[in-house]
Structure formats: structure tokens, C-alpha cells
Swiss-Prot record:
Part of the Tol-Pal system, which plays a role in outer membrane invagination during cell division and is important for maintaining outer membrane integrity. The Tol-Pal system is composed of five core proteins: the inner membrane proteins TolA, TolQ and TolR, the periplasmic protein TolB and the outer membrane protein Pal. They form a network linking the inner and outer membranes and the peptidoglycan layer. This is Tol-Pal system protein TolB. Belongs to the TolB family. It comes from Cereibacter sphaeroides (strain ATCC 17025 / ATH 2.4.3).
Amino acid sequence: MNLFRSLAPMGLALALLLPAAAPALAQQGPLRIQITEGVIEPLPFAVPNFVAETSGASQLAQDMARVIAADLSGTGLFREIPASAHISRVTSFDAPIAYNDWKAINAQALITGSVSASGDRVVVKFRLHDVFSDQPLGEGLQFAGSASGWRRMAHKVADVAYSRITGEGGYFDSRVVFVSETGPKNARAKRLAVMDYDGANVQYLTDSSSIVLAPRFSPTGDRILFTSYSTGFPRIYLMDVGSLATRSLAEQPGTMTFAPRFAPDGRTVAFSLEQGGNTDIYTLDTASGTRRQLTNSPSIETAPSYSPDGSQIVFESDRSGGQQLYIMPAGGGEPRRISNGAGRYGTPVWSPRGDLIAFTKQHQGRFHIGVMRTDGSEERLLTASFLDEGPTWAPNGRVLMFTREGAGAGGQPALYSVDISGRNLKKVPLSVPASDPAWSPLLP
């Protein structure tokens, strides 16, 4: 029986048409946010409506400017100056900028742009301006793509601005795979779905005929691992994002497989296998089918996650009597415990920057999302609620998304995000209950 409903491919071709401008954007200048763990005063910026260069592009020009502004202000590092406060109007992309008018409303950064549309093709041009230096940063850039991909182009513009001002990579042009949930708590229907990082453009990847859990993107974002109960027992499946073609992995009679995650090579998968009441961590070569056992313990070992260089794996285990976090070599070997605080630790995931491990912690009746150094030091709890669990990293390693669920029969799961300092906690706007988020890498 085919469990999966076919959808159109998600891919979108985008072109960077002025690559010569990229080095200019990389230059150092006075317009800068230094990201630290202390209190940051958001940088005031303005994004006036982009100029419509062709008839019929007016609404699109406004919509793109709004998405760009929402991306930046949503980080907590930027504060948008509303259009009602603007003194100047930008009526032409190449017209001189009245910098004094923007200084008068305390804007430090300004993004101007234009949009043209011809048939299904859309082109957006933009410039980032340092208002107090009275100059644009670089010669201007443009992206082109299909009209249906206009939000991606807006996210890419925001990524460029974020990167230039903070000196770090952005994360707006990315997707999140998650589990959509409907129905009462004791009989929920669960489907795989994907969305833009901000909750827009939801697409469903499976039907609700079986329970699905723990989806994970490949390092290139073109495949998704997940666990399904379509056979009555948990099994790992691999889906091609473009075609939705799906196949099972690591099948073996009398076993259950779950908690899969890709290695950075995109070929190897680490997962948990339960057999005869014992759960250990294995790896599987998805091309050859070769399987290797990494742990051999009477305890429960699960939730493996690779370091960015692929040399180590962090996982959870109750080998010490309680649920704790351990790190071992990627090829197996003696693990070392890294969690040392009171409470139970689970769902570890290594930051793409390599410096932190995020986790779920249960302590004194509360659940927390936290981070620690890879040696277990500097543990910080970022959230606290009735149930917070399952963190996933944004591509730049600065933001986490996770599941939060309220108490009682009416409590519904929802997706939230928080930055690694514990600030800027916010709910992802979705029309359905959702759980198990997993962030993609930046889209190509």
C-alpha cells in the first residue's frame, strides 16, 4: 500500500546575478552588530516598500519588503522603524538616497530594492545602506526566480543583510520538516510536513494512515529520514524530497529501528535498534547497506547526533542509572559522560558551529531546552515549561526550534524558537498542532 501522497517538488532555482558585488559586501565597515551573550540593543533599520519596475509588480514589491523586515526584526537583533515614521519615499532604485532623512528617524541600516515581473519570472534588486556613513555597502545585488518562489528571494535578501551586519551566516532561506498532529491526545493522526522557517508554505509529505516521528534532513536537504509505524512497529524510512519516493532502511526481523540521523557525509545514518529488549546505536551505509554496531550495553542507548566534522557522536543513555548524555568516537569506542547536573537529559543535537550541544532536560517536574559546551561545561537552560523537548539547530547555530506542549487533555503541541542566550522566545505561526521540528541546511 502506498502510504505517501505525491506533491510537486519543493526545489526552486535562484540565480545570484551580480556575483562581483559579493566581495564588497564582505568588507569591514562601521555598520556592525557584535553578537554576544549580554544584552543587545537592537539595531534600528528601515525597509521601505520596494519599487515596482513593471506593471503588476506593486503588491509583490510590498510583500517582499515586509518579509525581509519580518526576518530581520524576528531575530531580536534588529528593530524595524515603521513606515509611518519614514520621511523619505524611495521612488526609484537608482535615485540618490536622502540619508539625512533616515538619520532623522535614527535608522542605522536601510534596505532599498526594486521588483520586476515578466510572466513567471521575477527579479529583485537590492542595496544595503549604512545610513551614518552616507553610503551603500557594495554595488547592489539581484536575485531571479519563478514568481512562486518570491518568498525565497526575500529570505535570501534578508540573509545577505544579516550576514553583512553581524558577520555571521543567516538562516532565513531554509525549511523545517515537522510532524503535523490532529485529533485528541490519545488518538492523534500524524503526518510529515515541511514549511519555511517562519511557518509559511506548509506542504504535506505523507498521509495520516500511520504514525510518523523524528524526521531529519540530510546535509544537502534533498532527503529526509523519519520513523514510521506503518508495519505496526517503528521502522526507519528514507524519503527523496523532490519525488517523495520512499524506502525502508535497516530492516531486520524481530527488531525495531528509530531515532535516525545523518552523518555529515550524507551517506551514513546513525540510529537505534532494539532487539530482545536491548537498545543500541548502529550505523548504516545507505548506499551499500552495510550495518555496524557502535554500542553494546544492557542499557538504552539512543538519539545519536554527529559532530559537524563527523568524528564524534553524542547520544543519550541510562547506563549510569539515569538518563544522561555521552560522547563517543564516530566509529565506536569508550563513551565519556558530559552531563553532570541534576535531572534527566535527552535528545542531544550538536551545533553546526561545533561549539555547543543542545538537549532536553527534565528536572523537578519541568522540562527545559538547554545548551552546554561539548565537554559538558557552561550548561545553560534556555526555557522552562510543562513540556519542552526536541531541539533542532538553525543553520547558523544561533537559534533553536523545539516542541512545546501544554498540560491536560486540551494541551496541543506547537513549535517555538529561542536564541542561544535564552532571549527572543516566540511561537512559530502554524494553523495546526505540530511537533518534532528539524531544520534544513540553507537552501542552494
